[in-house]
């Protein structure tokens, strides 16, 4: 079972709302076939949170969202 906490991710992205948006956007990228930056045995949402907690993905995800 995946063990990732919001507190681990909040160290990288302190704003909870930006964290949720960044994780959502990254999870969508993973579903579309982008390569995971960490071990990807979990669902895309958990993998996205693991990437954020590891510092592999950050707030820059929000700058890539098309308007």
From Swiss-Prot:
It holds the Pfam family RNA_pol_Rpb6. This is DNA-directed RNA polymerase subunit omega. Belongs to the RNA polymerase subunit omega family. The RNAP catalytic core consists of 2 alpha, 1 beta, 1 beta' and 1 omega subunit. When a sigma factor is associated with the core the holoenzyme is formed, which can initiate transcription. Keywords: DNA-directed RNA polymerase, Nucleotidyltransferase, Transcription, Transferase. SMART domains: RNA_pol_Rpb6. It catalyses: RNA(n) + a ribonucleoside 5'-triphosphate = RNA(n+1) + diphosphate. Its EC number is 2.7.7.6. It comes from Ralstonia nicotianae (strain ATCC BAA-1114 / GMI1000) (Ralstonia solanacearum). SUPFAM superfamilies: RPB6/omega subunit-like. Promotes RNA polymerase assembly. Latches the N- and C-terminal regions of the beta' subunit thereby facilitating its interaction with the beta and alpha subunits. GO terms for molecular function: DNA binding; DNA-directed RNA polymerase activity.
């Amino acid at each position: 079972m995946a063990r990732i906490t919001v507190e681990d991710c909040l160290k990288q992205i302190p704003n909870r709302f930006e964290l949720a948006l960044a994780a959502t956007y990254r999870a969508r990228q993973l579903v579309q076939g982008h390569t995971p930056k960490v071990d990807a045995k979990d669902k895309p949402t958990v993998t996205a949170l693991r990437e954020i907690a590891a510092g592999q993905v950050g707030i820059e995800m929000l700058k890539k969202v098309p308007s």
